Amino acid sequence: MAIEKKFVNDGYVKASMDEYFAEQLNRAGYGGMELNRTPMGTQIIIYSEKPGMVIGKAGKVIRKLTRDVATKYNLENPQIDAQEVKKPELNAQMMASRLAASIERGWYFRKAGHNTIRAVMNAGALGCEVVISGKLTGARSRVEKFVDGYIKHSGHPVEEVVDEGFAVAIKKLGTLGCKVRIIQPGVVLPDSYKVRESVEIEEPAEKPAEKQVEKPAVAPKKEAAKAKAPAPAAAPEPAPTEEPEVAEPEEAEEAQVEASEDFEEAELIYVEGSEEVRRQVNGVWQHKHESYDYWHPMARVHKEAKE
């Protein structure tokens, strides 16, 4: 047998076997099958809502299915295993069978379609599509589609992530095809993406400011040099220390001199041969004379009077 004919024959056997099980196990809630060929034989897994009805009393039903499959499809040593479906709402074949049964019982097709969509989405599916085709109302056949969530229609992901089921409802006007397609929860789609959440970095707490120790003010070198300079020769007392030139206004100096008089009474020294009077206040020599009749430091340079 050519390789092409072998693949076609395998597909035909699987599709025909699926229809046979759906017909025989309709009351057991048939939900699909898997066919695996191994060196030990052919393993068939049947998914059902009621696996007890698939096995039958003392295994009577499952032995009958095994004999029929081996004879009809020429399979060597077939082994059938029945497994229960925990969530029938997420099985496309089961929901298609329920939809067809609801329409046969007389439900309006829109009500049956919306109920099927609602049950599937409440079970946690990412998306669901229900297609009902045939003579719904009137003499002409048409197609009604109900969609909720996200559904893939083409490409390779359709074969991997989309579960598809089909059932037939027989009405007086004719037959109706019921197709259900479901995307299971937790499926990672090729076009899905996740946005990273922004992370806020907390800034470290500021340390308390250290107390700054005030350093004692150091007198400039010029002031220290002038402080060591001897007093004028005309003074009978020890040489007074000279202060550097002060750029402050005369009013500030007068206020300083008056303030010093309140705290300390200094001894007055009269210079012979002139109207100059001297005194020492807080280590600073002061004098006053005819030109400047107020107490001021002796180190201050007097401006010459204009002619």
From Swiss-Prot:
UniProt keyword annotation of Acyltransferase present: no
Natural source organism: Methanosarcina mazei (strain ATCC BAA-159 / DSM 3647 / Goe1 / Go1 / JCM 11833 / OCM 88)
Biased composition range(s): Acidic residues: 240-265
Family per record: Belongs to the universal ribosomal protein uS3 family.
Encoding gene, per UniProt annotation: rps3
TM annotation in the entry: none
Protein's UniProt name: Small ribosomal subunit protein uS3
Gene Ontology terms, MF aspect: rRNA binding; structural constituent of ribosome
InterPro entries xrefs: KH_dom (IPR004087), KH_dom-like_a/b (IPR015946), KH_dom_type_2 (IPR004044), KH_sf_prok-type (IPR009019), Ribosomal_S3_C_sf (IPR036419), Ribosomal_uS3_arc (IPR027488), Ribosomal_uS3_C (IPR001351), Ribosomal_uS3_euk/arc (IPR005703)
